Amino acid sequence: MDDEYSKKAKREGYLARSVYKLIEINEKFSLFSSGNVLDIGASPGSFSQYAYKKLKRGILVSVDINDIGLRYDDNFYFIKGDIFLDDTVFKINTFKPYSLVISDVAPKTTGNRLVDTSNSFNLSMRIIDLSLEVLLKKGNLLVKVFQGGDEMQIFKKFEKYFKFVKKIRPKAVRKNSFEIYFLGKSFGK
């Protein structure tokens, strides 16, 4: 489906329209600072493309169970793996600490909203738990979540660990989508 964001992504050389969600959030909340960035669920790669452009110092580590179509010569590492597996977590930990963790990952959808939101919840909680292990003090975390399940539990977890917490629905989210983003800034209160 070619909407205005899809066409804009093609024109500007991004791999997916989802990049405009990250751009909008970053313009409002200044996610990037010096330090390493971790992109969990990086495929197809548009979040990583933008993150790489925004690197001030440090490296970008992109993780996904699928390959992504990005290769950069410097300051970029791709880890093909599942964040639920120890081997992948070990590789992620090799580059810690991170000043920012971003995730636009979504589970494979079934069409059953209850199942999909439950799977999104489990995936989001895993990303948060992993982020708590690898984030720098005062680091930032951005995670996509499907609405309609236990997202308030996720929000409360953010509030426990971050000084600033915000629920965001960027303009680039499709009208019929039930995705939102949770942002936590200044880890470690």
From Swiss-Prot:
Residues annotated as catalytic: K144
Reaction(s) catalysed (UniProt annotation): uridine(2552) in 23S rRNA + S-adenosyl-L-methionine = 2'-O-methyluridine(2552) in 23S rRNA + S-adenosyl-L-homocysteine + H(+)
Entry GO MF terms: rRNA (uridine-2'-O-)-methyltransferase activity
InterPro entries recorded: RNA_methyltr_RlmE (IPR050082), RNA_MeTrfase_FtsJ_dom (IPR002877), rRNA-MeTfrase_E (IPR015507), SAM-dependent_MTases_sf (IPR029063)
One GO cellular component term: cytoplasm
Residue ranges that the Swiss-Prot or TrEMBL entry lists as coiled coil: none
Binding locations of S-adenosyl-L-methionine: G45, F47, D64, D82, D104
Listed EC numbers: 2.1.1.166
Highest taxon of the lineage: Bacteria
Subcellular location: Cytoplasm
Keywords: Cytoplasm, Methyltransferase, rRNA processing, S-adenosyl-L-methionine, Transferase
Task of the protein: Specifically methylates the uridine in position 2552 of 23S rRNA at the 2'-O position of the ribose in the fully assembled 50S ribosomal subunit.
Protein family (similarity comment): Belongs to the class I-like SAM-binding methyltransferase superfamily. RNA methyltransferase RlmE family.
Protein name: Ribosomal RNA large subunit methyltransferase E
Organism in which the protein naturally occurs: Borreliella burgdorferi (strain ATCC 35210 / DSM 4680 / CIP 102532 / B31) (Borrelia burgdorferi)
